[in-house]
Amino acid sequence: MSKITEQIEEIIQPVLDDLNFELVEIEFTKEGKDHFLRISIDKEGGVDLNDCTLASEKISEVMNEEDPIEQMYYLDVASPGAERPIKTDKALHDAVEQPVFVSLYAPIDGSKEWLGVLQSVTDDHIVIKAQVKEKKKEVEIPRNKIAKARHAVLI
């Protein structure tokens, strides 16, 4: 996480806590000449448009007071969607028995990407049941080798 996104998280987390929303992800990017602050939120049962609108209004208020971003930017508050990132230990444990996609820093069994159902999580590793060719295979992945993880939709 960059310094600016850490600063933004400190500012908006109390607002989201008051609204009973979970902060899933913060992204501050430049696209062309425009800057975007994208914030993904969630709650038990999922968020809808009204939730995103309410959170956007409250976040705008505190961001205008604190003003941590020098340049003009567009604020986008949204649901993380079906393929939401898995960034915390809690989110990883909550994803057990669900489809996940994991990118690795280094290959395991010849692959740096694994798609399958998360079977278990420990402090040191995760186990994914993945489809390899015609059969299912359990793959043990050390947690320190995981570059990114997200929920997945299996078809």
Swiss-Prot record:
One of its GO terms (biological process) is ribosomal small subunit assembly. The keyword Cytoplasm applies. InterPro entries: Ribosome_maturation_RimP, RimP_C, RimP_C_sf, RimP_N, RimP_N_sf. Gene3D superfamilies: Ribosome maturation factor RimP, C-terminal domain (2.30.30.180), RimP-like superfamily, N-terminal (3.30.300.70). Its main location: cytoplasm. GO terms for cellular component: cytosol. It comes from the Bacteria. Keywords: Cytoplasm, Ribosome biogenesis. It is found in: Cytoplasm. The keyword Cytoplasm applies. Belongs to the RimP family. Required for maturation of 30S ribosomal subunits. This is Ribosome maturation factor RimP. It comes from Staphylococcus carnosus (strain TM300).
